[in-house]
Amino acid sequence: MKKRCVAFTILLCCFLAMTLCAHTDAPVNLSDISAGASYYFKNTTKLRAEVKNSYFIQQGSATDGEYGYFLALSNEKGDCTILKVDLSDYTIVSETPGVAVDHGNGMAYNPKTKQLIVSRCTDHPNRLSFIDKDTLTITGSVEMPMRVISVTYNESRDQYVVVHNHDRQFSILDSQFNILSTYDMVEDMFSNQDIDCDEQYIYLLQWQSSNGSNVNYIGVYDWDGNYVNRIKVRSLSEIESMFHIGDRVILAFYAGQVIVGEAQLYQAE
């Protein structure tokens, strides 16, 4: 019995030592991102939406701080449904079909104009369309000098960022959509998806299909166009769009339906 107790004590001590020495990845915020470290998002699914009438391909998304607005594409119809989602409990408030924004690859929200701005991407590749956030109807548009795949907006800077659809570049625009600066992207092996930003960083979503699996990364740049780092997104689905409210990050995916989740950022040890 004494030998068994000694053996058990030794095993217990070894287990405790291993536990104390084990590294645990630390949760961090977007503002904590810096060069040299390794980061990843762990996503928790909050909504799986079976949208009516063939609208099931998630594309761009944006938020006004209370609701999320998600574009669901119909390849059959060539337009989108806008899903308005209450972000307090992820219930769908409304579905607005037949919104003529083509592919609707990217979307931003401008609280100063109370408009959603959509990059149309396919049939009208240079066009950004404006949508009234209350009526969810198109109220106007602007033609850009280049093809645009995605768009985001930062209120404190009063500036937009757009990703080009014909090269590996992104541009910063003023509030009237005039180009202020253009920068090259570092990652060149992935397909560009939507884009997000805050006062500190610009987040460029990228996806690649590799051996039948989806590989998702988010490139992080500062507002001077400098590449800072990238975030790996741990998900088997194709990432489509991202927005965040403070430190609360919402990601949208496509996997045969619209999938929305909340993501926690971790710094890998």
Range-by-range predicted roles:
Residues V28-Y55:
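A short helix->beta-strand "capping" segment at the edge of beta-propeller domains
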Residues K42-K52, T91-P97, T137-E143, N178-V186, ...:
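A short beta-strand motif characteristic of beta-propeller blades
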Residues R48-D79, H103-G106:
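Beta-strand-rich domains and repeat architectures in extracellular enzymes and scaffolds
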Residues S54-A62, V101-Y109, M144-S156, D188-C197, ...:
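Repeated scaffold domains used in trafficking and secretory/extracellular systems
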Residues K77-L83, H124-F130, D167-L173, N211-G219, ...:
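Structural motif
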Residues D86-Y90, I131-L136, D174-N178, Y221-N226:
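Short loop/turn segments that connect beta-strands within beta-propeller blades
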Residues Y90-L116, R120:
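Blade-loop segments of beta-propeller domains
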Residues E187-V220:
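Loop/turn-rich, solvent-exposed surfaces of beta-rich toroidal or solenoidal domains
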